[in-house]
């Protein structure tokens, strides 16, 4: 136990006394005996002659006295066998409102109820022996009632303490639940943000993979591999044409495709740079606006201060050329405003020139890349037309061999020579018009047959 639990204050003759050294077995009778002995010793040591009023209060054996418990206007008599330390600890937080008073048993009220004043000692005029007999006869039947009251009070105090201990865990549990909910919401928010970021990263990876596979298929099957896969009738012809293409054309096409992919990447980088430049321009405009607002506020404050100075100067020196001083102040104010506006204008002009230079540079780079892309596209179209010409020549050779089996070899070579310029002219026309490879093949087949006939 703590030191506070070992001490109990008891009021005796309107004087508070602390009774220390209490144990669990200490009863109210023990406390009464100790208080009477201490009081009588003090009275004997002082040797006072005024024993009539105060000294007569504590005359008699300890059985004639009892301890009354008072709490918020209520009081009750504690039996002699009551464990005072247990009762004191059972009060708990209400110990500040509890007070123990030592009185004579005859002076205390037998019933328990609210009292406005403290118990006063009433001196009896009869003999002490008669008082003892009366006290024995009067207190005999009320001891059981007092015990029941004390037990009931202990039960009530136990219930109060139990309820208090139950409410505290409930409050703590509700607070813990709220904290767990808050932590759960925060963790879910964090996981959702991570999942959104991961989804964006996966989308970018998917786009890159699709672009890579597209370029790989273009390298392997050609630019029009989609048309070749869906046009079933020309699949065999395309396969034979791809087998007849020389390896040099394939290598050149692969190089062109690689250049094309590189240029596309550079274009994307340029677009990113342009977006960054636009963001920088927006930031610069915001900074310029803030600077203008700041300068305007400073100028406004200067104007207000100058007006105050002018008013003070006009009040002090109204008789000594007030008009001239006002003119001078206005001139200085105009000069400061002009210098500030000039500085701001120069600053804005330099910033705008720098931004224009950056924009011109990016536009120039964009035009160069676009020209390179156009040239690459033209070269790809030329390669397609040349491949179609090779296919047409191979088909012409096959047909000439099949038709002129009875003729001489010189005639077949002559027919081939006659058929070649017509094919070149037709291919030139198709390349000039910019038609696709499929249309160029259709246009090549007609003149070859006419020359053979």
From Swiss-Prot:
CDD domains, per database record: RA_RASSF10
Q: Which UniProt keywords apply?
A: Coiled coil, Cytoplasm, Cytoskeleton, Neurogenesis
Q: Which InterPro entries match?
A: N-RASSF, RA_dom, RASSF10_RA, RASSF8/10_RA, Ubiquitin-like_domsf
Which chain positions lie within coiled-coil regions?
Answer: 262-295
**One of the Pfam families matching this protein, by short name:** RASSF8-10_RA
Chain intervals for the UniProt region annotation (Disordered): 299-322, 402-453
Q: Where is the composition biased (Basic and acidic residues)?
A: 299-310
Q: Which residues form the Ras-associating domain?
A: 1-107
Q: Where in the cell is it found?
A: Cytoplasm, Cytosol; Cytoplasm, Cytoskeleton, Microtubule organizing center, Centrosome; Cytoplasm, Cytoskeleton, Spindle pole
Q: Which GO terms describe its cellular component?
A: centrosome; cytosol; spindle pole
Q: Where is the composition biased (Polar residues)?
A: 402-411, 433-444
Q: What is its main location?
A: cytoplasm
- Tell me one GO biological process term: positive regulation of neurogenesis
Reported function: May play role in regulating embryonic neurogenesis.
Q: What is this protein called?
A: Ras association domain-containing protein 10
């Amino acid at each position: 136990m703590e030191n506070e639990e070992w001490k109990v204050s008891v009021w005796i003759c309107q004087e508070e006394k602390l009774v220390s050294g209490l144990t669990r077995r200490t009863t109210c009778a023990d406390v009464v005996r100790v208080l009477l002995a201490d009081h009588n010793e003090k009275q004997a040591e002082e040797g006072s002659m005024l024993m009539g009023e105060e000294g007569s209060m504590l005359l008699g054996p300890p059985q004639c006295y009892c301890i009354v418990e008072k709490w918020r206007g209520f009081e009750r008599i504690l039996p002699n066998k009551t464990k005072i330390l247990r009762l004191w600890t059972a009060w708990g937080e209400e110990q500040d409102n509890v007070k123990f008073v030592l009185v004579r048993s005859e002076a205390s009220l037998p019933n328990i109820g609210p009292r406005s004043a403290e118990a006063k000692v009433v001196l009896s005029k009869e003999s002490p022996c008669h008082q003892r007999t009366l006290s024995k006869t009067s207190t005999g039947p009320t001891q059981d009632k007092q015990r029941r009251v004390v037990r009931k009070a202990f039960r009530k105090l136990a219930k109060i303490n139990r309820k208090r201990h139950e409410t505290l865990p409930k409050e703590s549990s509700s607070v813990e639940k709220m904290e767990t909910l808050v932590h759960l919401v925060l963790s879910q928010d964090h996981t959702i943000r991570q999942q959104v970021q991961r989804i964006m990263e996966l989308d970018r990876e998917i786009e890159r993979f699709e672009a890579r596979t597209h370029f790989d298929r273009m390298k392997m099957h050609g630019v029009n591999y989609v048309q070749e896969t869906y046009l079933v009738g020309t699949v065999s012809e395309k396969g034979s044409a791809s087998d007849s293409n020389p390896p040099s054309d394939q290598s050149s096409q692969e190089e062109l495709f690689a250049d094309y992919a590189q240029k596309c990447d550079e274009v994307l980088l340029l677009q990113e740079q342009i977006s960054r430049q636009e963001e920088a321009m927006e930031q610069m405009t915001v900074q310029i606006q803030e600077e203008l607002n700041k300068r305007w506020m400073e100028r406004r404050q200067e104007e207000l201060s100058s007006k105050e100075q002018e008013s003070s100067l006009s009040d002090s020196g109204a008789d000594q050329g007030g008009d001239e001083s006002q003119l001078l102040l206005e001139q200085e104010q105009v000069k400061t405003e002009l210098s500030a506006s000039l500085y701001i204008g120069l600053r804005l002009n330099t910033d705008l020139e720098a931004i224009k230079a950056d924009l011109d540079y990016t536009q120039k780079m964009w035009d160069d890349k676009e020209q390179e892309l156009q040239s690459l596209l033209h070269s790809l179209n030329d390669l397609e037309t040349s491949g179609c010409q090779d296919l047409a020549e191979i088909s012409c050779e096959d047909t000439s061999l099949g038709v002129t089996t009875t003729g001489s070899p010189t005639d077949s070579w002559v027919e081939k020579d006659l058929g070649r310029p017509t094919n070149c002219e037709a291919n030139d026309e198709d390349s000039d018009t910019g038609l696709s490879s499929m249309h160029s093949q259709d246009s090549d087949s007609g003149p070859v047959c006419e020359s053979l006939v």
